[in-house]
């Protein structure tokens, strides 16, 4: 892959450190009064999710990681995993459940997901940032709930995600949900 110098370090840059793919989360350039300047970076491992700090002397270079993203549509799920299709080439690919555990609650058929690949192999699947989901189950809002300061109630979406929604949301309504935090954003339809 391509080598990048410390002067090219940017947040979001994908690099390879000790044979592992990382993404730069934070980059601080430090020029002490005495001694050589250096970059202190905070990186997240794509495979393990662990965040570590590394220091590089000014002018050092490291390899970029062969991490690519591909947009694919979820066709269906079964006991083995989920089958995705590329909308342009119509190629289908089965992703096993072990790679989908952290997003299982966000799997919805006919939705486009981002498959992250490292050296050609899928290492993770990322859902869209916002999804429109229908409320499958929630308790009815009772008059007087807001008097006790309670303005949110638990709800379960059609994908099985458990979220907190305002008390005026009822079963069957469609809501917009932020998949990064699992929080309610807005009502889509009534």
Swiss-Prot record:
Pathway: Protein biosynthesis; polypeptide chain elongation
Keyword Transcription: no
Broad class of the protein's primary localization: cytoplasm
NCBIfam families assigned: efp (TIGR00038), PRK00529.1 (NF001810)
Protein name, per record: Elongation factor P 2
CDD domains, alphabetized: S1_EF-P_repeat_1, S1_EF-P_repeat_2
SMART domains per the UniProt record, alphabetical: EFP (SM01185), Elong-fact-P_C (SM00841)
Family according to the record: Belongs to the elongation factor P family.
Lineage, top ranks: Bacteria, Pseudomonadati, Chlamydiota, Chlamydiia, Chlamydiales
Protein source organism: Chlamydia muridarum (strain MoPn / Nigg)
